[in-house]
Each structure stands twice: as C-alpha cells, then as structure tokens.
C-alpha cells in the first residue's frame, strides 16, 4: 500500500535524537567493542532504511535484522554495511542471503549444504555467526560439545565463521543480575572450550540494550542495541546510567470539535457518558493505526500542554478526546500528541504501554503503515 499524507495523523521520527543515542552508546562502550544497530521490525516501527542509514552515519558498524526480507529492503536502498540475520534463514533463502553479502545465524547443520552450495556457485565466502542458547531456551546450541561439533562441520573454504553470540533473557531485571551472570558464564565456558580445541572466532557478542547499559564488563567484541537505539529503556533503573532521547512521537489533528450536552454517550457500546457539557474532539486515528482500544476511557493525549482524556471506545479509524480543560480554544489546526518526549511535557511511551497492558517495544511496532513517518 502506498503511504500518503492525506490524513492529519503522523509519526515524527527525530534523526537528531537517534544520532544522540548512537553517540551515547559509542561513548559508553568498552574500547574494542563495536555497535550493532538492530533495525528489525522496520526499525521497531520507525522505518528501517532511514534508521539504518543515520545509525551508520552516527557511528554504528553493523546492522541486525530478524529475517532476510528485512535485510533485502536495506540492501535495495543501497546500504552496504554488514547485516546479521538474527533469526533462522531457511535453505531456500540462503542463496539470496549469500548473494547480498548477508551474515547468517547458524545453530545446526540443517542449512549447511545450502550455504556451501550457494557460496560455491556465487564464488563468494558465506559469513556466519553461531548462535548459543545460554539460557533463553529459544534458538541456539546448548553445550560446548554441540558447538564444537558444528564448528568442525563449518571448516570449509566456502564458509567464514565470523562470529558467535548468545542472548540474555533477564538483563533488564533491576532486582537480581544472577541469571544474566549465569548465562554469561555459560557463554564464556563455551568460548573457552572452543579455544582449547584451537578455534578462534573474531566477533563474540551477548549484550542486548539492557546488558549494554548495565553490564559493561560483558560488552565483548560487539553489542546489539535495539529498543534503546530509539531512546527507550528496557527498565526504569537504566535511566540513571545512560541518558537517551526518545526518537518517536505520534501526532494528529482534530477533524471536528463540538460541544456535547450532559449525559450523552460517546462511541460504541456506550461505555462513556458526559457528566456536563463537554468539548469533544474527534481524531482521525484508531486501533487500525496502533492506537489501542485498551486506551479507551483510560489513556490521555496532550493538547497545548494539557492532558486530555480519551473518552469512549477507540474505533478502527477514529477516536474521541475531551478537550474541555484546555485553556485556549482548540481548532482543527492544533496538534494533538498521543505520546512524545516526556522532557518536552508529553505523555511518555512507558505510560501509554502500561495502559495498553504491554511493553513499549510492542507499542511502537503496532503503529500501522498507513500512518506516515516524518523524519525531522
């Protein structure tokens, strides 16, 4: 679907804030550590290509995505930086990955022949990173014996084992770091076993956003920063360690403002009724845009610095807010901020996500493609 701007609703993406965040992380890293900017899920809803390009300009050295489709979009935009496919790549997609110089995650011999065949026929060397399951129980090899066995199978002229990595399950826990250290020790044990067998792998990485901020002793050769690249924290306690700026804000303009009499129901299901004459503004956004129904009669938006309640059920394409408390007249030219930078007086994503009974990772990813992204 072609995204147009014929509707007064949009997402603002601050590339200056993104640059600030990348540089904050670069300054925070251990000297030998590189920064991978994770831009999967269309850059967490921010737009993968603009985010990737600016992140690299600001100092990131590597990109990370979940699947090959996401990486191909970045390659088609002319971005040539290394890209790691963090998830599984099926055999039928391996050739395209190798053709476009994408780095594959491998944790079994399932795709090994496809990788070798692709590299041989394309006259290229396939780069791979081995995935270790140190306690997430998702994908990866669990033991040093399994890793060594795979490493032995990978000793062919068609393949370059560039990296090995794991993923932390509980690094954002502000009450205990025990499980994170347990995972780190497991990963280190596997590294030691590989070295004892004579294997040396150049890039070892384990830190996600939370671990990158909280555990500098685990930075190793590279860190993978996803959610915090966008100025969002996996845990509130991490704000005390590293200053970041929220990159995304969600805005709209009213399509109608009207006075509604007392005792008048608003929207589907009659879940809200005015107590007095109220000034109600209708916004051209709804749950199809990621403006969740869970915010109905619970959430607030900001108009002229005033927090205005969302009233009635949020519809698929429209929603209503009560602007009665705004001190100035609200017009169709006024900007309503759904969420934005807390330091600028807007409702932060953390609050919106909590009211949606989810996490801000999901909140930003839910904003639909029909909401245009404006890069400022």
From Swiss-Prot:
User: Which cofactors does this gene product need?
Assistant: pyridoxal 5'-phosphate
GO CC field = cytosol
Q: Which SMART domains match?
A: Ala_racemase_C
This enzyme catalyses:
L-alanine = D-alanine
Q: What is this protein called?
A: Alanine racemase 1
Q: What top-level branch of life does the organism fall under?
A: Bacteria
Annotated EC: 5.1.1.1
What is the name of the gene encoding this protein? alr1
């Amino acid at each position: 679907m072609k995204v147009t701007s014929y509707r007064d609703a949009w997402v603002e993406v601050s590339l200056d804030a993104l640059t600030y965040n990348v540089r904050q992380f670069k300054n925070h890293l251990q000297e030998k550590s590189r920064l991978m900017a994770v831009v999967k899920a269309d850059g967490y809803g921010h737009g993968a290509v603009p985010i990737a390009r600016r992140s690299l300009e600001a100092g990131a050295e590597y990109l990370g995505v979940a699947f090959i489709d996401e990486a191909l979009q970045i390659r088609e935009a002319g971005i040539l930086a290394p890209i790691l496919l963090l998830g599984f790549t099926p055999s039928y997609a391996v050739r395209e990955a190798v053709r476009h110089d994408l780095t594959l995650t491998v944790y079994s011999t399932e795709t090994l022949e496809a990788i070798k065949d692709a590299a041989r026929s394309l006259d290229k060397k396939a780069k791979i990173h081995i995935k270790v399951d140190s306690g997430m129980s998702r994908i990866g090899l669990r033991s040093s014996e399994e890793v060594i066995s795979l490493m032995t199978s990978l000793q062919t002229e068609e393949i370059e084992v560039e990296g090995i990595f794991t993923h932390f399950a509980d690094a954002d826990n502000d009450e205990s770091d025990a499980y994170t250290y347990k995972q780190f020790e497991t990963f280190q044990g596997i590294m030691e076993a590989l070295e004892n067998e004579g294997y040396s792998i150049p890039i070892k990485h384990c830190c996600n956003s939370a671990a990158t901020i909280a555990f500098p002793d685990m930075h190793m050769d590279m860190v993978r920063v996803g959610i915090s690249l966008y100025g969002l924290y996996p845990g509130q306690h991490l704000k005390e360690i590293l200053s970041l700026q929220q990159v995304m804000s969600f805005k709209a303009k009213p399509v109608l403002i009207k006075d509604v009499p007392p005792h008048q129901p608003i929207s589907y299901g009659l879940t809200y009724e005015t107590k007095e004459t109220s000034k109600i503004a209708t916004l051209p956004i709804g749950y199809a845009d990621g403006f969740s129904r869970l915010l109905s009669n619970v959430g607030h938006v900001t108009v002229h610095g005033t927090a205005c309640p969302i009233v009635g059920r949020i519809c698929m394409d429209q929603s209503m807010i009560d602007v009665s408390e705004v001190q100035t007249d609200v017009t169709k030219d006024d900007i309503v901020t759904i969420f934005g930078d807390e330091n600028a007086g807007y409702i932060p994503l953390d609050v919106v996500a909590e009211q949606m009974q989810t996490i801000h990772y999901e909140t930003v990813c839910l904003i639909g493609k029909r909401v245009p992204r404006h890069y400022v």
